[in-house]
């Protein structure tokens, strides 16, 4: 009897997880015209699981690049890096567009919660020494004329190489750790400041106690 109850409970949990996966619109490509977000299907509870799943997926993709036994090349390193993190990019694009244009208290709270998580994830990519070495190797190949890239390919390589440099990939371990701390703190402070500004703007009221000051306005505005 206990075994039956345990089996049924396990099945219920698995079904719930499967249903949650199937109903989260961020877990698959948007099936709308032009790939526009399914705003009518997106709910506040979808964002955090999508952020975490997106981070998990990109970590696995980065790991595959780093652990590749192939010689670093444009396709297996730069293109693979550029193609990583599709789920994360999808949820970030929608979430931050809405927090800028149509936010609410729940969205603001989530943005403060997820900011340091995303900051850490970004540092884990651009301070990853093994990944940086592969990107730098491809960049060096082009500098030495060992590979020929199109204008678009060169632009992509240059973008990622400079992103690693500017993100501190060339710093020693101690400075990188300090940079991680600063980035994490800045990510939280930036969101907190933005939310404070928004709250102040929303709380603003203009009191007009002299009707003459409304001269020139249409009647329907008055």
What are these language model-derived features?
Residues 17-222:
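Zn2+-dependent metallopeptidase catalytic domains
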Residues 1-22:
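Bacterial Sec-dependent N-terminal signal peptides
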